[in-house]
Amino acid sequence: HSREPGPADDVPMPRPRRRETPEGLLVNRLAGKVVSAPGSALREAFRVAGRFAGDPIGTTTDAVKFAMSLRRVLAPPDTPHSPALTGGGSGYRLDTFDVAFDDLKASGRAAGGSVNDAFLAALLGGVRRYHEKLSITVDFIPVAIPVSLRTDADPMGANKFAGARFVAPVGEPDPKTRIVAIHDLIADARLEPALGFLDLIAPVVSRLPGIVLSRLAGEMTGLSDLQASNLGAIGRPLYLAGARVTRVYPMGPRPGIPAMVAMLTYEGTCCIAVNFDPEAIADAAAFSSCLRAGFEEVTALAHGG
């Protein structure tokens, strides 16, 4: 207290308390639980996450490693959002285009990567071109993708995926270098013990109030500028009311982010669908055109480009 109405000059003002986000609270809570959990619970956690299956967890060291991995998995990407992919609303715009599967596969192989690596490299190349068209220089953007957790021990046909966030090299002009960088980023992500943590916490999270779940989901999904997903392939012809289906475009959800790009391969064609926010992406026509150019840039590698 004071005898004067104004603050005393020689008394420092108290520092404001740091506001915890729902995601931050969840990280701290889970990290503490993992460190203090008994060995049997940790074994189950690692089993569900697809890591260290069958190995005994007998020391605190492994628990601490899991907790540290959990912090890395949930930490916001260490790069700012792109100024060209800002804002956001409830509207959406859909765009579709096709790419030859053999070309995309050969392009990935030319750089020592996969079809998925080439797909992501093409998207980043398109986003880079969009920034250049707007005279904006951006080296990295936060990107989210699903990562396969399948191992040789999993049964044939089993699918195991977990969401991962990356600081993606959108400013890299060389498509081969982008493919290599993406391949390495995904390989590193697969080594995180806590990557499949959502399977571990699902029984607990499902009991949270709806408003908490909504805020938590918004915080976790809204950290990226771009989300992409390669949904694999349909291995047989499809028919609708007797008519043969010629294309299948996967319209992926856009969970509070500027753009969601999904790819599904059908009869030798990569069917690509873009769901983007017209309020976050001001020049929709340019964005679509640049994405197509990004794929042309990458698929040129298949022909010695």
Where are these regions (language model features)?
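Soluble acyl-CoA-dependent acyltransferase catalytic core bearing the H(X)4D motif
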Residues: 1-257, 261-292, 296-305
